UniProtKB/Swiss-Prot annotation:
Belongs to the thioredoxin family. It comes from the Eukaryota. It comes from Caenorhabditis elegans. This is Thioredoxin-1. Pfam families: Thioredoxin (PF00085). One of its GO terms (cellular component) is nucleus.
Length: 115
C-alpha cells in the first residue's frame, strides 16, 4: 500500500495508485520510503523522515509497505529495508539503502536546492 505522508493529519491513504500520483505531479520529486512494520531500522529512521516531510513541502514524501506493495518493490528493485527511492516522473533518480540518516538528509537538501 502506498501512503502519502501528510503529517498534519498523520498519514493519508491513497485510493489511487502510484501512476496516478506521478501523473498529478510530473515535475515534482517523489521520495518513496520502502519500509516494513516489523523492521527495526525502518522504525529508527521514521522520525527523521517525518521531520523532512514536514519541513520540505516542495517534495512529496510517501511510505510504501513492502509487505503490501510487491509491484513497486519489484519496479524499483528493492532488496532491503528501509530503501529510499527518489523519483521524478516515475523514474528513479537516486536510491539510498539502510538507516542512513545523514545521507538521507543531505540528498533531500540537494533536491530541494535544485528545484
Amino acid at each position: 500500500m502506498l501512503k502519502r505522508c501528510n503529517f498534519k493529519n498523520q498519514v493519508k491513504y491513497f485510493q489511487s495508485d502510484f501512476e496516478q500520483l506521478i501523473r498529478q505531479h510530473p515535475e515534482k520529486i517523489i521520495i518513496l520510503d520502502f519500509y516494513a512494520t516489523w523492521c527495526g531500522p525502518c522504525k529508527a529512521i521514521a522520525p527523521l523522515y517525518k521531520e523532512l516531510a514536514t519541513t520540505h513541502k516542495g517534495i512529496i514524501f510517501c511510505k510504501v509497505d513492502v509487505d503490501e506493495a510487491e509491484d513497486l518493490c519489484s519496479k524499483y528493485d528493492v532488496k532491503m529495508m528501509p530503501t529510499f527511492i527518489f523519483t521524478k516522473n516515475g523514474d528513479a533518480i537516486e536510491a539510498l539503502e539502510g538507516c542512513v540518516e545523514d545521507e538521507l538528509r543531505q540528498k533531500v537538501l540537494e533536491h530541494v536546492s535544485a528545484q
